Amino acid sequence: MAILKVDTISGIGTEGPVFEGDIEFTSQNFLTLPKGDTIQRGRGRGLIVANYIQPANYNTSEFITIQSMGNSIDFGDTSAAVRSHATLASSTRALSASGYVAPSNVNTIEFFTIATQSNSTDFGDLLGGSGSYAPISNETRGIFAGGYAYPATFNNIDFVTIATTGNSQDFGGMTTLRADGNRSAVNSSTRGLIAGGYISPTGTNNIEFVTIATTGNSQDFADLTAGRSNFTGLCSSTRGVFAGGTNPSNNIIDFVTIASAGNATDFGDMFTGNSVACCSTSNNTRGVIIGGDLQPADTFTNTMQHITIATTGDSLDFGDMLTTGAYRNATSDSHGGLS
């Protein structure tokens, strides 16, 4: 039973009720008021793009509702079966770029309309063709940093305007050339962090940052709690969280405050154990870590696990993907760069 008492309701039949003056809400349970316009209130979708199930790539994509635990649902397909690609998004459009399409790496960029289940559409091309880019985005701009195409490693950074199809443009370069791509990224609406990667003979703990709205080379930020590659990153508008990885394999979750340069701090552990090549997505409160290659058994999993970004602690079960797999990539319409 709910009781709503107001002095005046106006606009009936035209623009809906308008509440004027002081309004007081009393609830015996939890009360969350909506914010934003109608489209914004519908946000919260995580998109998981393509897949790798040893020994083959797949072009299938799936989606989840981040705030509601449960299994993934089929979304659509990329134009080619791909792995080690990079995905990023505005609140309406998701881009998937580069990656390995047998027998070589590609430089293609495709896009999905996040609210509509459908196949991808051609967007344009990156300046170079490689895999394992670190993706960064806000509502306007998408950035792809680094890249790896055996045996070559790249430190270039490209950018695109997400709302406008076309080829990428040069943004700058990364300060640290990592001997293997496989780095991760998190971002707010203004700053992007690029973390980890492989510098022989082990994973690096280096974190660099870029200012999204301006072009230029990356700058030193701080260090992860442990050097690693093949791991994932997710974020709220203030906090970036990194999970899993290899060199060596681990179940580490650590975090940084994006606006303040400083070393990462322990967050908790992944309940699945050591996970390599998992991916992740988030809204401003919840992060979801998806799939991966569990070590040392070398077993691909379809498990999804979640964390509350603002509070530390171990991950908890979220649901299952339709298929097992690793080397996917994921994004959302409500990640930290959009909040």
Name each model feature, range by range.
Residues 2-339:
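Polar, enzyme-active/binding microenvironments
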